[in-house]
A protein has these predicted regions:
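Subtilisin-like serine protease catalytic core
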Residues: 1-124
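Short acidic, glycine-rich surface-loop motifs adjacent to enzyme active sites
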Residues: 5, 9-12, 131-153, 174
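Acidic side chains
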Residues: 86, 103, 136-137, 181
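Sec-exported extracytoplasmic/periplasmic mature domains
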Residues: 92-96, 132-140, 162-166, 176
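Structural motif
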Residues: 103, 134, 187-190
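Loop/turn elements at helix/coil->beta-strand transitions in domains of secreted/extracellular proteins
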Residues: 107-112, 136-142, 165-171
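Substrate-binding/specificity loop regions of serine endopeptidase catalytic domains
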Residues: 123-127, 146-191
């Protein structure tokens, strides 16, 4: 219809699409949509599936047993590790190629990779153990750029945070990505 034609014509006017036919733009859009569907497929099939539990196979622990400390694997890169990589770059990044961008602490920062929240699967036990692991292995500052509205094991996370504080470790916590007033809406581990 005419509305679809208007949309396609406006897309053809975008700088990246100049010179392409509407058919070529349509093909590019199809590829983008397919990529987006593939990217978010795990959320639909795993994150929102209450019966899906990858911990037994991947992590090898009993999530309800907070006394377990030694579990997990060394797969810190994982399928979607871009957030931690991005934050590490802000902290300690060095220029590549023609770029002259440095991280804010590139001369002094050393990065210890501890992936406690893989692919958004934030569990209080994992967060508490990751804090203790990093502190016990010499970390001086912990970036905690994650959070959630519900925290069933928050006591364990708070205890780990107090442990870090006693050891002189600075915790830099996120206030959330949802544009919420954390004075009115709880967001853990921030409040």
């Amino acid at each position: 219809d005419s509305r679809n034609l208007q949309i396609l014509n406006s897309l053809v006017q975008d700088a990246e699409n100049v010179g392409k036919t509407p058919k070529e733009v349509e093909e590019l859009l199809k590829k983008e949509v397919e990529g987006a569907l593939k990217h978010y497929e795990s959320q639909a099939t795993k994150h929102y599936n209450l019966d899906f539990d990858p911990r037994k196979e991947i992590v090898g622990d009993n999530y309800d047993n907070y006394n377990e400390k030694h579990y997990g694997n060394n797969h810190y890169e994982g399928p979607d590790a871009s957030h931690g990589t991005h934050v590490s770059g802000i902290i300690a990044g060095l220029p590549h190629g023609n770029e002259a961008q440095y991280g804010v602490a590139h001369k002094v920062a050393k990065i210890m990779t501890v992936r406690a929240v893989p692919d958004g699967d934030e569990r209080d036990k994992d967060v508490a153990n990751a804090i203790r692991y990093a502190v016990d292995n010499g970390a001086k500052i912990l970036n905690m750029s994650f959070g959630k509205a519900v925290s069933p094991g928050k006591k364990h996370v708070w205890d780990a945070m107090k442990y870090a504080e006693k050891k002189g470790v600075l915790l830099v916590k996120a206030a959330g990505n949802d544009n919420q007033n954390i004075g009115e809406n709880e967001y853990f581990p921030t409040n």
